[in-house]
Amino acid sequence: MELTHFNEEGRARMVEVTEKQETVRTAVAAGEITMRPETLELILDKKVAKGDVLAVAQVAGIMAAKKTGDLIPMCHPLNLTGVDISFTIKVPDTIEAKAKVTCVGKTGVEMEALTAVSVTLLTIYDMVKAVEKGMVIKNIRLLEKTGGKSGDYRREE
């Protein structure tokens, strides 16, 4: 398999996509943050001093997806057509975040989905770190992607 982010001299480059066909691209990524049960209870009861943790984290994840091209050096800036962040509470101590990102474009949105999930979880950490510093962000992964020349991908869990 060829690594496409290097030129003939072995130096970094942004992949040329001018001739690629525009298709609908989607990606879904997920990750988790674990914490003490008491910390999760504070979040769910909306008793964290900084505000509604999940609402703020959701907006942060959406913003992060839109800024991925500014954060990851070889990512193309994309005109996203949709970003959705959702949460699954896994009692007693875990929040799973999922990001679904969509665009019509010449390159995939996997990095946007992964960035969205990462920043969503980092925002949860930031908002409750005064209560607990031992939280663990883990298992950030691409679950699926559709569109493009390489075809569809679905992680076997």
From Swiss-Prot:
NCBIfam families: moaC, PRK09364.1. It is an enzyme of class 4 (lyase). Belongs to the MoaC family. The keyword Disulfide bond does not apply. Gene3D superfamilies: Molybdopterin cofactor biosynthesis C (MoaC) domain. The active site is at residue 126. It catalyses: (8S)-3',8-cyclo-7,8-dihydroguanosine 5'-triphosphate = cyclic pyranopterin phosphate + diphosphate. Keywords: Lyase, Molybdenum cofactor biosynthesis. It comes from Carboxydothermus hydrogenoformans (strain ATCC BAA-161 / DSM 6008 / Z-2901). This is Cyclic pyranopterin monophosphate synthase. Pathway: Cofactor biosynthesis; molybdopterin biosynthesis. Disulfide bonds: none annotated.
